[in-house]
Amino acid sequence: MADKADWQQPGLLHRAFDAAVTGDPYPVRAYISMRHNILSSLPDPDTLRSKLDKLDLIVAITTTWSPTADYADIVLPLSPALSRESILASKLGLKPQFFRRQRAVQPRFDTRADWEILCGLASRLGLDKLAFSRIEDIWNYQLEGTGLGIEAFDATGFVPLAPAPRWKTLAEATLPTPSGKIEARSRLWAASGHDTLPPYTAPERPAAPDQFRVIPGRAALHTQASTTNNPLLSELAPTNTLWIHTERSQALGIADGDWVEVCTATGPVGRLRAKVTTGIHPEAVFMLHGFGRKTPQETRAFGKGVADEACMVSGLEHEDPLGGGLALQKHFVTIRKAEETN
């Protein structure tokens, strides 16, 4: 870890905001978000906001409005992908390569490329070695010692680093474990007090006839939570619906297309239309991620659907002790039929 924190603090973002509250392992005073809408991508945004309130400064570098941008102290407008160059990047695999992205159209509305924003900040902070004024200078700096010039990218935009794909033989195909193989039970984790193959424990089940496990998901039309306000995509997928099993919906008096209200233990979350189907487990309901926006600048997405992350009360506490990931399908909601609205 660059910050010298040990394996108990393995660079997990949701833990960083705990440090803003507790000061452990060190105080965190500012957060600079680069195209990351944290208030939609992590569970329980209300609890997360209470932690963000402890910070002195929040900066959002973004191409679009979002709950995080609206909450930030400063918003730095980022040029969209086609309007910005990027630093050289690498692609791994059987035939690794360097690649370059160039600007296709001129930026609008005084937006800037990511490198322009970061180099501008470096200049203001007196970090002259990082204060590049031209993307070409960054590219040449990156290529120092490689034997390549930037003209090598002119033909196709990428430079292969191997003449052909390199396949490993079975004898070479080992894993970075003590045995070199897949280990169902890890001795390394066991030595640190973690059982990697514990006895099976049945998951918690709904406790009432109107209670369901809520499952979030994605759609091919949208990218995470970043495109629901897009003028074209919002026409094709303007809101989300609540998938609910046919038998459970009948017991609750809910028909396909009815308005339903979603509630957690802390109260109502929002309303959306029901999609009655046999294609879901009877104990679960499903909704697409990225909706239920309350940011007034997002005029197309504002007030449409329900935010799945708002259904995940205490979700920042449900962490896998080994991998560190948050459990997003561990939460329950209650569903009831709602009155029709004009």
Language model: regions and residue ranges:
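Extended redox/cofactor-interaction regions of prokaryotic respiratory oxidoreductases
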Residues: 1-70, 80-88, 156-252
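Alpha-helix boundary/capping detector
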Residues: 78, 94-97, 101, 147-148, ...
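Catalytic, metal-anchored helix/loop core of enzyme active sites in primary metabolism
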Residues: 73
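Catalytic alpha/beta core of large soluble enzyme barrels
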Residues: 76-77, 308
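Glycine/threonine-rich phosphate-binding loop and adjacent beta-strand/alpha-helix elements that clamp
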Residues: 82-107, 117-122
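Short, charged helix-to-loop "capping" segments that act as catalytic/coupling loops
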Residues: 24-25, 91-93, 265-269
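Long, contiguous, secondary-structure-rich segments that constitute the structural scaffold
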Residues: 104, 108-161, 227-243, 248-342
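Short flexible/disordered coil segments
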Residues: 25, 94-97, 196-209, 276, ...
